[in-house]
């Protein structure tokens, strides 16, 4: 590499490869700035959490898929997608998130409600796909080039009602299993919003008994 090229690269944790800064949505160095996850206690009431589960059950759950809508052994759960038009509460829910984060709800995906039964899990992953993958390019086209900047996850069941099922961030050495109605907001990119940050890598640990319900709202801004 020339001196000029070296000045335009960052070292990544992915096989220690050096990537041009123009390589949007690649994995950056763990040393780049990253905003830690934030908890919002009692974002939803117990009754509102029960309502979301009820709405998902009424609409119907399908086997969760990852990467280009394919089933995968990396995830064993059931999923339902809900829009702000499906129920008056959902419209209010999207507005509540918009007001909390100061981001217009036009940047939100549909709400994903997820059920994990015993032995259910989601192995380590990033919520934002890598641009090198063909399906990722197609996904970005669908969302007008906007990546999944943030994940807004809400715990819908009492943590005492199931064993296991923690949300674990290995690069942060942090684990979350929060009270019902608590929201967890975490970033998927570094602070420049150009690269996928290693600290965003996380997993849904195995549910050993009981049922775990969460919902995910992905924000593209």
Residue ranges and their predicted role:
Residues 1-221:
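Fe(II)/2-oxoglutarate oxygenase catalytic core
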